[in-house]
A protein has these predicted regions:
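Conserved alpha/beta-hydrolase "acid-adjacent" motif
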Residues: 202-211
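C-terminal catalytic histidine-bearing segment of alpha/beta-hydrolase fold enzymes
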Residues: 20, 210-265
Length: 265
C-alpha cells in the first residue's frame, strides 16, 4: 500500500483528494470515499481517511475527497461541483494507470451519503446543471445513513436545518435546487446500491434509507438495505460491524457475486 498522495482538483484549499493505492502493480478497482458532517465546515476529510486506508489495505484504490462546505466557501452549487470535479479528475491523476475506471464505487456517510447518491445519479441531470455530464461511470454506491430525501429532511429540520443551509432555503423557495440536488429525484441511476443504517440513529432517521431504497427499487435499480444495531457514527468505525458488512458487499461485487435486490435488513 502506498500513499496517500494529495492531489488538488481546484484552486481552493479544500479542493483536493487523497489517493491511496493498494499493493501490487496492476489496475485496482476504485472506491471514492465522501465524508459527512451535514455539508458544514466543522467536519472534514479526516472522517474519510480511516475507511480509505482500510479499503486500500484490502486491495482497492481508495480516494478520500475533501470539498468546499457551508461556512468555508461551500453550499449550493460549490459542494456538488467539487464532488463532480474530483470524480472527473480521476482519469488525469499521475497514477491513473493503476486505476480501473471502468466502474467506480462511491461510499458516503450522512451528508456524504447524499453526495454519493447524487454522484451516482449525475447522468440524469439536465445539460448545464451543476455536475452534469460525468466523465467517469459510477456503477455502485454505498450510502451509510445517507440524507437521501432532501425535501423530507428539510421538513424535519434535520441537523438544525442543515439542508436549508446547504441549499439556501426550503423546498418552496429553492424548488429547482432541490430538484437538481435530491437523490430521490435522480432515479434510476443504473448503479448497484447498498444502504446501511443504524437502528438507533437519532441524527438521520432510518426512514431516509428506506424511502430512497423503495424509490430506487421501484425505478428498476438494484438496491439492498441493511440495518445494524447502533447510532449514527458507528457506521464509520473501520473495526465495527457496519463497516464489516460494507466490506463484504464490496468484496462480493469485486468477485462477481453481487446483484441482489432486497429491502429487508
Amino acid at each position: 500500500m502506498t500513499g496517500p498522495v494529495v492531489v488538488p482538483y481546484g484552486p481552493h484549499a479544500d479542493q483536493f483528494l487523497e489517493l491511496t493505492l493498494p499493493a501490487g502493480a496492476g489496475p485496482a478497482p476504485v472506491v471514492v470515499v465522501l465524508h459527512g458532517g451535514f455539508w458544514r465546515a466543522a467536519h472534514g476529510v479526516e472522517l474519510a481517511r480511516p475507511l480509505a486506508a482500510d479499503l486500500a489495505g484490502a486491495g482497492w484504490a481508495a480516494v478520500a475527497v475533501e470539498y468546499r462546505r457551508v461556512g468555508a466557501g461551500g453550499g449550493w452549487p460549490a459542494t456538488v461541483e467539487d464532488v463532480a470535479a474530483a470524480l472527473d479528475a480521476l482519469p488525469g491523476l499521475p497514477d491513473a494507470g493503476r486505476l480501473d475506471l471502468s466502474g467506480v464505487t462511491v461510499v458516503g456517510h450522512s451528508a456524504g451519503g447524499h453526495l454519493a447518491a447524487w454522484a451516482a445519479g449525475r447522468g440524469r441531470l439536465p445539460a448545464g446543471a451543476p455536475g452534469a455530464g460525468p466523465r467517469v461511470p459510477v456503477t455502485a454506491a454505498v450510502l451509510q445513513a445517507g440524507v437521501l430525501d432532501l425535501r423530507r429532511a428539510a421538513r424535519r429540520r434535520l441537523g438544525a436545518r442543515a439542508v436549508q443551509a446547504f441549499l439556501g432555503g426550503g423546498p418552496r423557495r429553492r424548488a429547482r435546487r432541490y430538484a437538481l440536488a435530491d437523490p430521490v429525484r435522480l432515479l434510476p441511476t443504473g448503479a448497484e446500491v447498498l444502504c446501511v443504517h443504524g437502528t438507533g440513529d437519532d441524527v438521520v432517521p432510518p426512514g431516509q434509507s428506506e424511502r430512497y431504497a423503495a424509490a430506487a427499487a421501484a425505478a428498476g435499480d438494484r438496491v439492498e438495505v441493511r440495518t445494524v444495531p447502533g447510532g449514527h457514527m458507528g457506521l464509520v468505525d473501520p473495526a465495527g460491524e457496519a463497516w464489516a458488512l460494507v466490506r463484504d458487499w464490496l468484496e462480493r461485487r469485486r468477485d462477481g457475486r453481487g446483484g441482489r435486490t432486497t429491502l429487508e435488513p
